[in-house]
């Protein structure tokens, strides 16, 4: 029997704190107090983007935010998340 490795855990470090999330549920990033990862910045929507493990990789998906999600100056609706 072949066992598959567990999906990688997503760890987010922000403002001196650290949170880890397992695959299987969506992680909401935004300025709302109930967001999984809260960023209290007026340029960030209440539920700005969703982090999701899909097809073997973690993705950051813009959630229809007013200001959009940018990477290196380009507006990106979906971004692959890579380990640093």
Regions found by a protein language model. Give the residues of each.
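Intrinsically disordered, low-complexity acidic Ser/Thr-rich regulatory segments
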Residues: 1-42, 52
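Forkhead-associated
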Residues: 26, 37, 47-84
